[in-house]
């Protein structure tokens, strides 16, 4: 399958989400068609990609010889992509009725769709740089959903979520620098990227980078001591809590 199809599950939900944000509040039918149509189309493309994997990754931009923004699909990313493709449409169906009582539906469904594209980007990342980009973009996309009610509890939960996510981002960034310094590439490759024959000092740096990456990415997985954002984020509408627990924690973390 053409590697350019990897862009569809990422960009299509983002475009439909942006379109939903521009609708008038009373255009419920049009909103539901846009949201469900974009999600189902993206999920169908994910299914097609899993059944007929592209022969090579799609490189979107290169930062020299060892860094790039690229998308790809292997066995593990296919599992996570299928998880998104199945869970998101079901949550959307539930949300259409649920959000009638919550208000600000355009805002909710706009960022709901955008988050689909961002999380699909996490699943389809073919390099550590790409994963980091979408991983941090997921924080920005889900923050308006966590703070949907905009009351005291929601604002507090949003601030905690943002601060812990920024702390995790900083730790991962430092670990990427170390891996770029001592590794062979930042692409996801079979057999790993750590060369043989590293000195004791270089190995110590990489051990530290691993610990930073573990806790940095562990923020989304609610790893102790960075777990407190998850129960606080339960003030968000129920569909958001479901996705945070079932998708963001399981897959993003």
Which functions belong to the PLM regions below?
Residues 17-28, 89-101, 144-153, 221-234:
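C-terminal ends of transmembrane helices
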Residues 52-69, 130, 137, 169-227, ...:
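Juxtamembrane/interfacial segments at transmembrane-helix boundaries in multi-pass membrane proteins
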């Amino acid at each position: 399958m053409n590697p350019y199809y990897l862009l569809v599950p990422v960009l299509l939900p983002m475009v439909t989400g942006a379109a939903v944000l521009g609708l008038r509040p009373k255009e419920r039918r049009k909103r539901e068609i846009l949201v469900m149509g974009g999600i189902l189309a993206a999920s169908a493309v994910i299914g097609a990609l899993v059944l007929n994997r592209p022969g090579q990754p799609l490189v979107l931009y290169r930062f020299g010889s060892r860094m790039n923004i690229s998308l790809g699909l292997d066995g593990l990313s296919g599992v996570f992509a299928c998880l998104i493709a199945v869970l998101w449409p079901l949550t959307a169906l539930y949300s259409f009725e649920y959000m009638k009582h919550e208000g600000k539906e355009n805002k909710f469904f706009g960022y709901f769709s955008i988050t689909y594209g961002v999380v699909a980007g996490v699943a389809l990342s073919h390099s550590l740089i790409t994963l980091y980009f979408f991983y941090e973009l997921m924080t920005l996309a889900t923050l308006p959903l966590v703070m949907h009610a905009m009351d005291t509890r929601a604002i507090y939960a949003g601030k905690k979520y943002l601060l812990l996510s920024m702390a995790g981002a900083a730790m991962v960034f430092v670990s990427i620098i170390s891996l770029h310094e001592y590794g062979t590439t930042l692409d996801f490759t079979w057999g790993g990227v750590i060369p043989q024959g590293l000195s004791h000092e270089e190995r110590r740096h990489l051990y530290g980078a691993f610990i930073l990456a573990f806790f940095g990415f562990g923020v989304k997985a609610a790893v102790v001591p960075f777990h407190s954002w998850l129960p606080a984020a339960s003030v968000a509408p129920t569909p958001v809590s479901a996705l945070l627990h079932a998708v963001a924690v399981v897959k993003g973390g």
